[in-house]
């Protein structure tokens, strides 16, 4: 049984059909990366799994249990199993670094502040940040350090499933490589299932076990990361090599 099973996922906004029947599985302990250009439905797919958006049709099962339509305490219990690294880090500038890391523990799980701080320091250490940054405000940190803090927050409650939204956006190549290494380290160390969305092929190659390509609201290819450069799929070939000419370009021009 897959950890995550998505079938026939559809979502439209007014006349704009974003998801047109998305299907994929993610095995337990696997790192799936969903690639695709801007506006192809990557973020909408993640938001549907998280319950931030309600799909118009389709099924999303976690460990064989349907999650579409969950609300109240049932939704809250499901969310406790998730961790999320947002594209812009999404840290609270009014809180100290350790309070950002511990926010979900204190507010969502009722963990006492002293214990939550200990956990926060432990998770900061796991992403290469020392105790000296704990009392600082996020604005006092570099973009790369903020991303590390956000990763520490994502793993603070030791979730079963981690979601990464464009984890290396805005980072220089060296810091992006650091974040990619930390993602792999955290995913493997915790034994969690991971779903990432990105258009960064360097990041994809480093963190993915399997890759799915989303185009015009459908998965057009799904396979092992090792096969990405010889997929035999014209959409994938054009995207990963950054070629202007190809089926993606032709369909955009015809739209």
Predicted features and spans:
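Short coil-to-helix segment of the ABC ATPase nucleotide-binding domain corresponding to the Q-loop/switch region
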Residues: 94-103
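Conserved catalytic motifs of ABC-family nucleotide-binding domains
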Residues: 158
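Helix-to-loop junction immediately C-terminal to a conserved catalytic motif
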Residues: 50
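Conserved ABC ATPase signature
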Residues: 137-141, 145
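Catalytic Walker B motif of ABC-type/P-loop ATPase nucleotide-binding domains
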Residues: 162-165
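Conserved ABC ATPase "signature" region
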Residues: 65-66, 113-132
């Amino acid at each position: 049984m897959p950890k995550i099973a998505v079938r026939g996922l559809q979502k439209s906004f007014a006349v704009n059909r974003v998801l047109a029947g998305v299907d994929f599985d993610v095995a337990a302990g696997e790192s799936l990366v969903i690639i695709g250009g801007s506006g192809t439905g990557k973020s909408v797919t993640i938001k549907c799994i998280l319950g931030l958006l309600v799909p118009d049709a389709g099924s999303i099962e976690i460990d064989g249990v349907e999650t579409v339509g969950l609300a109240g305490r049932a939704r809250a219990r499901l969310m406790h199993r998730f961790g999320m690294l947002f594209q812009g880090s999404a840290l609270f500038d009014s809180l100290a670094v350790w309070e950002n890391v511990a926010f979900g523990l204190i507010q969502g799980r009722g963990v006492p502040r002293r214990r939550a701080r200990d956990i926060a320091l432990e998770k900061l250490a796991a992403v290469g940040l020392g105790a000296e940054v704990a009392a600082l405000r996020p604005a006092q940190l570099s973009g790369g350090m903020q991303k590390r803090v956000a990763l520490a927050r994502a793993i603070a409650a030791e979730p079963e499933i981690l979601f990464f939204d464009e984890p290396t956006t805005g980072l220089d190549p060296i810091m992006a490589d650091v974040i990619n290494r930390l993602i792999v380290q955290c995913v493997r160390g915790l034994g969690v299932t991971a779903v990432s969305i990105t258009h960064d092929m360097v990041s994809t190659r480093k963190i993915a076990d399997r890759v799915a390509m989303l185009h015009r609201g459908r998965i057009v290819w799904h396979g092992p990361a090792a096969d990405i450069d010889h997929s035999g799929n014209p959409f994938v070939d054009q995207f990963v090599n950054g070629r202007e000419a190809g089926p993606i370009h032709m369909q955009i021009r015809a739209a």
